Amino acid sequence: NKSCSLDTITAGSKLKIDRVPEDDQNLLKYFVDNNLMPNKSITVTKSERSLGVITLNTENNTDVVFSFEIAKLIHVTKF
């Protein structure tokens, strides 16, 4: 399966994280704290383009919400 950016994914998709941006230390800490690291599984629970936010459910069953701007920087592969 081909890697693509998270902002292109629809709700209900089960994914594996391939890459997260590492140049912003605060953002990287947020990803680590929320278990959003390469090879981790996530599910897109909501993709609200009109609001500009995407909601994920992580491996440890935590909901994480962030902007499409951030989602563009995360590369994923569909299961």
Regions found by a protein language model. Name each.
Residues 1-70:
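Mid-protein regulatory/catalytic core that forms ligand/cofactor-binding pockets
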